[in-house]
Swiss-Prot record:
Originating species: Ralstonia nicotianae (strain ATCC BAA-1114 / GMI1000) (Ralstonia solanacearum)
Function: Converts molybdopterin precursor Z into molybdopterin. This requires the incorporation of two sulfur atoms into precursor Z to generate a dithiolene group. The sulfur is provided by MoaD.
The protein's annotated pathway: Cofactor biosynthesis; molybdopterin biosynthesis
PANTHER family recorded: MOLYBDOPTERIN SYNTHASE RELATED
Originating gene: moaE
Subunit organization: Heterotetramer of 2 MoaD subunits and 2 MoaE subunits. Also stable as homodimer. The enzyme changes between these two forms during catalysis.
Family designation: Belongs to the MoaE family.
Protein name (database record): Molybdopterin synthase catalytic subunit
């Protein structure tokens, strides 16, 4: 049974993986991802990030994401822990861990869950910078990552989409 937790408290990777594996000799692979707060985003220094969520709705959305992964891959178990509240650079934000009999399924499912979570999980992020507070929009690159799994969304703002398109063109110009 997958575990979903939304919490303010930090988590211990070693303890969480040990709990996921305990008493399950059929597990041949565990893949995990930890996301952390960066000290810079979109060219501005970030001193703090505040994550908000809608209790109940967020956990249900995360459970649906994990269920989608469980249907796509032969997983033994999965774990998602997402922190909320005020976080500082280097703090852990999210842990995604999946257990399977084989590494290929574990890696793919872990990446799928994280791609899906970045675009579809109902969290709201506010960053504190030297210029003041700003809300963080969904990124077009996150939507592109999710689209490779056959899931199309439109959560990124038009401004974010235009900026990503301009960045893509600039990269093409540099590569030419």
């Amino acid at each position: 049974m997958p575990t979903i937790r939304v919490q303010e408290a930090d988590f211990d990777l070693g303890a969480e993986i040990a709990a996921l594996r305990a008493g399950r000799p059929q597990i041949g692979a565990v893949a995990s991802f930890i996301g952390t707060v960066r000290d810079i985003n979109d060219g501005s220094g970030v001193s703090e990030m505040e994550l908000e969520h809608y209790p109940g709705m967020t956990e249900k959305a995360l459970a649906n994401i994990v269920d989608a992964a469980m249907q796509r891959w032969d997983l033994i178990d999965a774990l998602v822990i997402h922190r909320v509240g005020k976080l500082r650079p280097e703090d852990q934000i999210v842990l995604v861990a999946v257990a399977s009999g084989h590494r290929g399924e574990a890696f793919a499912a872990c990446e799928f869950i994280m791609d899906y979570l970045k675009s579809e999980a109902p969290f709201w992020k506010k960053e504190q910078t030297a210029q003041g507070a700003r809300w963080v929009d969904a990124r077009v690159t996150d939507e592109r990552a999710l689209a490779r799994w056959g899931i199309v969304t439109d959560n990124a703002s038009a401004a974010t989409a235009q900026a990503a398109s301009a960045n893509d063109q600039n990269q093409k110009d540099r590569d030419a």
